[in-house]
């Protein structure tokens, strides 16, 4: 083998791989897996510069040969990997790398080829520690020296094969790969300055390190020389050196087979094997077959297999642990949910028991009434008239409650109740069950607030959004007093059994929510100028008695109508009792609650006007605003005080008697609405185009008492529901209910409710409040009514437009409700749309 090595010796520079620099352009990988023997022989000879020729078909097969692998992004030079400062010696890893290189060299030697360039700079490692052969510039230089010893014909053949391989490599390379590798080269050059082993210096010394003793004395390279180089490589694998100077000293000592003490102590077996490979006499070095059959090579393979099996077992255990952790986490969360559910069920059971006890007390106190005399035997037996069993379905409970309620009302009125009527349930009415989830969430919200208030020693009833102001019951009645209490006198409901706790506010809210189900048209306001294109109604307002209501809009007129005459008289055209003409489009109206005939208006020119309706004349004009005034309000507690909000970013306070402003609040955005609370003239709320609601104490107008943040678009309306609760409307499609008593910090970002169901994205659609009921318009041409207790609509009504030519009702998607107003504390309201249609509506059961 050695005797024939001289003529066949080739450096890797003469293989089928072109010259490469240290940045490792595309490579060919040598291995011996799944390759037919004859093909392996010819391929290896081609790679190492054999003089044998290939058939064209075999040449073409090299591109897909399993031995060939293109350089992948992330591959690193074995030299760079060895010289990493942070590299620690992993025995299995080092032996795995060494064994791969031994197999590469053995493949060459089996064909009588001396590899010559068994040096770290001529190999690359993948991210999976897979070693592949490449050729660097240093390999070419050193290889050229060795070629001078060989015949010229062999050199020419090698050059020919190199050119052939270069053309193939260029053909298969993508332009983008070259660009990436070029960028990587630049980065490497920049990093060279900071590296402890600059590549240029290392490559210059590497050739001398890996030169065998016989080559130093002028002998040609042999297979034994490759074995010597393997010994040097094995030493570098197991003996990392931290500094450049120490590296030079260590490698110089290695020439004399002097090993550092640390490798002798830590790796005696590897050190002994290394000295065998580095023997100065070539004949005393092991052959490649001896290497491959040695325990040093074979035993690590067995150990590696055991290690891989152990790793696989560990991975499977970790997978099981991950699954176990996942299942335990699910169990923990489900247990937490079960605990919460258990607490919820316990809370519900306690509340049911409390309600049943209250029911018994109420019915015992009312046993003298004829309504309950027929059911006295139920109370004496200790059973309530209606109790909810744990195993009873909610729908069945609701059905039985409905039947009992209908039966009681029918017996009171002396009417027989048929079975079919008794069989109707709240489920069939669908409102309760359709909104069951929302009602449930409000119930739990009420309970949480009650428990929190109880913990802090506060009362829920006074400020609860579910209860009426000051704990009073509903004051709202229909025009014919259709909403009545058939059960007991008022004094009966003011007894101790209905005071405090969560039951009263939630029950009141639920009853109020279920009291009405629809809006009915009581009357249509028919005007003579219906064909006028400028009929948009911007404002509606009732006087203090609810007898007169005023309309105003873009037609620059204030029209006063008598409500009862419109409801009772079926006329083709309704004429206003008073009509006041302005000079500009009108935006807002407000009656004086103290002076019956006095009404205030604002217009698009920024003027606030006071009118005397009885004399049909203008009393006062106030012109201090610089831009359009959107909203005005006269204080009920101080009827001489008026507030106005304008596009000029100011809120002005006016003395009606003096006709001048007495105060100004400046803001950074347009003011769209203002509102006094009904019981005070010392505070004021207004909404702004900056999406916020501001609440001021007018005795300190420099800073707001509270800022309510929650809307995402312009706040178009604000109305006080009661002295401590405020509702705001925005063009973000929502109404929000705010508790002013929860704003001790000056910022309130948590509304009690967000009412959704209507559509409001760009227009002013109106807002009005009456005893807990909140009416608003929608850009779908509908009127929506909410109750402050729940976030979903109680009812809605769709306006149908009348065609001016045919008189028929038609749908017009461009129309929207533009204004709305309750008639005092009644179930009646008046609404107008953008087409000028005005309807008087009434809530019905």
From Swiss-Prot:
Keywords carried by this UniProt record? Coiled coil, Nucleotide-binding, Nucleus, Phytochrome signaling pathway, Repeat, Transferase, Ubl conjugation pathway, WD repeat
Name the residue ranges of motif: DWD box.
685-699
Question: Per the UniProt record, which residue ranges are transmembrane?
Answer: none
What residue spans carry the region label Disordered?
1-33, 139-158
Its GO CC terms are: nucleus
Q: What GO terms describe the biological role, i.e. biological process, of this protein?
A: photomorphogenesis; red, far-red light phototransduction
Q: Entry's PANTHER family?
A: PROTEIN SPA1-RELATED 2 (PTHR44218), PROTEIN SPA1-RELATED 3 (PTHR44218:SF1)
For domains, the record's comment is:
The protein kinase domain is predicted to be catalytically inactive. The DWD box is required for interaction with DDB1A.
The molecule here is called: Protein SPA1-RELATED 3
What taxonomic ancestry is recorded? Eukaryota, Viridiplantae, Streptophyta, Embryophyta, Tracheophyta
- Tell me the name of the encoding gene: SPA3
């Amino acid at each position: 083998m050695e005797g024939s090595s001289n003529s066949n010796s080739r450096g890797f520079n003469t293989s089928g791989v072109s010259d490469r620099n240290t940045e490792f352009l595309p490579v060919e990988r040598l291995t011996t897996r799944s390759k037919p023997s004859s093909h392996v022989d010819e391929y290896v000879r081609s790679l190492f510069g054999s003089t044998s020729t290939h058939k064209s078909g075999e040449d073409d097969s090299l591109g897909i040969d399993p031995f060939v692998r293109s350089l992948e992004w992330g591959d690193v030079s074995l030299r760079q990997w060895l010289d990493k400062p942070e590299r620690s010696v992993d025995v299995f890893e080092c032996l795995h790398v060494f064994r791969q290189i031994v197999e590469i060299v053995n493949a060459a030697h089996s064909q009588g080829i001396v590899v010559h360039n068994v040096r770290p700079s001529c190999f690359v490692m993948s991210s999976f520690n897979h070693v592949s052969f490449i050729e660097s510039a240093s390999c070419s230089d050193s290889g050229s020296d060795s070629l001078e010893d060989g015949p010229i014909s062999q050199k020419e053949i090698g050059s020919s094969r190199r050119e052939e391989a270069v053309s193939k490599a260029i053909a298969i390379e993508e332009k983008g790969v070259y660009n990436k590798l070029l960028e990587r080269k630049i980065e490497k050059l920049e990093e060279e300055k900071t590296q402890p082993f600059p590549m240029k210096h290392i490559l210059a010394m590497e050739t001398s390190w890996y030169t065998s003793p016989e080559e130093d004395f002028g002998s040609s390279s042999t297979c034994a020389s490759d074995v010597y180089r393997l010994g040097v490589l094995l030493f570098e694998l197991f003996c990392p050196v931290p500094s450049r100077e120490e590296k030079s000293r260590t490698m110089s000592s290695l020439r004399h087979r002097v090993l550092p003490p640390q490798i002798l102590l830590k790796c005696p077996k590897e050190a002994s094997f290394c000295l065998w490979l580095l023997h100065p006499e070539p004949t005393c070095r092991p052959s490649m077959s001896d290497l491959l059959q040695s325990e040093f090579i074979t035993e690590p393979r067995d150990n590696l297999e055991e290690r891989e099996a152990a790793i696989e077992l560990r991975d499977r255990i970790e997978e099981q642990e991950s699954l176990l952790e996942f299942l335990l986490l699910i169990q923990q969360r489900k247990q937490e949910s079960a605990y919460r559910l258990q607490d919820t069920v316990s809370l519900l059971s306690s509340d049911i028991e409390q309600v049943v006890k209250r029911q018994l007390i109420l019915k015992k106190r009312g046993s003298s009434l004829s309504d309950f005399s027929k059911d006295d035997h139920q109370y004496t037996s200790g059973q309530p008239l209606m109790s909810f069993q744990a195993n009873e379905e909610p729908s069945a409970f609701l059905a039985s409650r409905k039947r009992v309620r209908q039966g009681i009302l029918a017996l009171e009125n002396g009417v027989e109740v048929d079975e079919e009527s008794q069989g109707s349930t709240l489920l069939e009415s669908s409102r309760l069950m359709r909104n069951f989830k929302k009602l449930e969430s409000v119930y739990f919200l009420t309970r949480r607030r009650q428990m929190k208030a109880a913990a802090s020693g506060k009362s829920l009833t006074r400020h609860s959004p579910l209860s009426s102001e000051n704990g009073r019951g509903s004051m709202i009645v229909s025009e014919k007093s259709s909403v009545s209490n058939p059960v007991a006198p008022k004094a009966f409901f003011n007894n101790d059994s209905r005071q405090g706790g969560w039951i009263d506010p939630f029950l009141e809210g639920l009853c109020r929510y279920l009291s009405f189900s629809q809006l009915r048209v009581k009357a249509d306001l028919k005007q003579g100028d219906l064909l006028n294109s400028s009929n948009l109604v911007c404002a509606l307002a009732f006087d203090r008695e609810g007898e007169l209501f005023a309309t105003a809009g873009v037609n620059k007129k204030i029209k006063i109508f008598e409500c009862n005459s419109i409801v009772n008289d079926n006329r083709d055209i309704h004429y206003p009792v008073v009509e006041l003409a302005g000079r500009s489009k009108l935006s807002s109206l407000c009656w004086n609650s103290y002076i019956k005939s006095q009404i205030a208006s604002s217009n698009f020119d920024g003027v606030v006007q006071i009118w005397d309706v009885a004399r049909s004349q203008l009393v006062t004009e106030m012109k201090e605003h610089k831009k359009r005034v959107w909203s005005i309000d006269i204080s009920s507690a101080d009827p001489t005080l008026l507030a106005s909000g304008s596009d000029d970013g100011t809120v002005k306070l006016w003395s009606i008697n003096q006709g001048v402003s007495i105060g100004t609040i400046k803001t950074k955005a347009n003011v769209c609405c203002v509102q006094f609370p009904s019981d005070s003239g010392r505070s004021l709320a207004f909404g702004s185009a900056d999406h916020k609601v501001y609440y001021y104490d007018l005795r300190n107008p420099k800073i707001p008492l509270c800022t309510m943040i929650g809307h995402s678009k312009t706040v178009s309306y604000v109305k006080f529901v009661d002295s401590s609760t405020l509702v705001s409307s925005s063009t973000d499609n929502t109404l929000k209910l705010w508790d002013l008593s929860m704003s001790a910090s000056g910022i309130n970002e948590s509304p009690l409710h967000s009412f959704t169901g209507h559509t409001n994205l760009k227009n002013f659609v109106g807002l009005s409040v009456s005893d807990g009921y909140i009416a608003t318009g929608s850009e779908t041409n509908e009127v929506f009514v909410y109750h402050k207790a729940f976030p979903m609509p109680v009812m809605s009504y769709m306006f149908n437009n009348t065609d001016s030519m045919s008189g028929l009702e038609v749908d017009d998607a461009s129309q929207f409700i533009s204004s709305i107003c309750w008639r005092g504390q009644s179930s009646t309201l008046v609404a107008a749309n953008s087409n000028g249609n005005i309807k008087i509506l009434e809530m019905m059961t």
